[in-house]
Amino acid sequence: MDNKPRRDRKIDSGKRRYLPSSERKQEILDAAFEEFSRWGFLATSLERIATRAGISKSGIYAHYPSKDAIFEDILVMALVPQDSHSTLLESGTTDLSEILDRYLDRIYATLGSQQAIATFRLLVAESGRSPDFVQRWGRKLLEHSLVGDRGFLDACIERGIIRADVSLDQYLLAGAPSALWLVLMTLFGAEDNPVSLQQVRPLHRRLLLELLEPK
């Protein structure tokens, strides 16, 4: 089941429905996204989220300890690939080109989704209302992503697939094409994006190969 926030789903608050935990959490995330988009994070209360989701405030606490935890879940589910990159090594291959192709498939499928673009728009809007808040969450999101990336890089180094002296800073900079592509997708949409996936992905791949390939 898709565990990312679905922005287009209307939540019926007229009658309490008993749902599995995963579905209830999904409704909370959908409701929270709508409220955050309308009012901003600071002005949105758990009561507003509960009302839109059609549950009580205590119903939210059964799944999330705070509004911050809800916001973090929205960001991580929309902007960070849900499967660990280390799963790319499960086939046993040591071919760096093959691994990178599968890695980029995962990255661009995540960042090109409507959920990711809508969430990035929310972050941009929120940065005007409360820049300190967005910087804090941006750092948390980056840390969450880099922890997984570090584990992936270490596993590749252990297998002799990539250079042993690759730093996370270098790896982050090599990912700049995907960040630019997400910004342009957010600004222009898929139809009018001046930089196509067919242009940006080969550049991203080449930068990663130059950085990671054993010398």
Where are the predicted features?
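Short helix-capping/turn signature of helix-turn-helix
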Residues: F41, Y64, V124-S130, K140-L141
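Short amphipathic alpha-helical segment with a characteristic S/N-K-E followed by hydrophobic residues
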Residues: I28, S66-E72, P81, F133, ...
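Helical hydrophobic small-molecule/effector-binding pocket
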Residues: E98-R129, S178-L180
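Basic, helix-initiating cap at the start of DNA-binding domains
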Residues: M1-W39, A43-I55, A62-A69, T94
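Amphipathic alpha-helical linker/stalk segments
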Residues: I74-Y103
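Amphipathic alpha-helical packing segments from all-alpha helical-bundle domains
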Residues: T110-S113, A118, P131-E158, P202
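C-terminal effector-binding regulatory domain of bacterial HTH transcription factors
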Residues: E210-K215
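Hydrophobic/aromatic-rich alpha-helical bundle segments in the mid-to-C-terminal region
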Residues: Q135, D154-L207
